[in-house]
């Protein structure tokens, strides 16, 4: 799977074996700014400050 790995949506990398999810972390405050993107084996947990969304197709984050 290929995932974006910077806050900018046009830079991506091929994920290592076992990392079959892409994630996007968005700051909840002040304005839903994209904070972090990358590969994961499990979806990171949403916290008080960051909302994570995961998906499993190329460049879906």
UniProtKB/Swiss-Prot annotation:
One of its GO terms (cellular component) is other organism cell membrane. Gene3D superfamilies: CD59. Transmembrane segments: none annotated. Expressed by the venom gland. PROSITE patterns: SNAKE_TOXIN (PS00272). Keywords: Disulfide bond, Membrane, Secreted, Target cell membrane, Target membrane, Toxin. It comes from the Eukaryota. GO terms for molecular function: toxin activity. Coiled coil: none annotated. Disulfide bonds join 3-22, 15-39, 43-54, 55-60. InterPro entries: Cytotoxin_Cobra, Snake_3FTx, Snake_toxin-like_sf, Snake_toxin_con_site, Toxin_cobra-type. It is found in: Secreted; Target cell membrane. Belongs to the three-finger toxin family. Short-chain subfamily. Orphan group XV sub-subfamily. Has low cytotoxic activity. This is Cytotoxin homolog 3. It comes from Naja melanoleuca (Forest cobra).
């Amino acid at each position: 799977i290929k995932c974006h790995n910077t806050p900018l949506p046009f830079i991506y990398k091929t994920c290592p074996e076992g990392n079959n999810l892409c994630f996007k972390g968005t700051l909840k405050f002040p304005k839903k700014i994209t904070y972090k993107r990358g590969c994961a084996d499990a979806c990171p947990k949403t916290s008080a400050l960051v909302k994570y969304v995961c998906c499993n197709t190329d460049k879906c984050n």
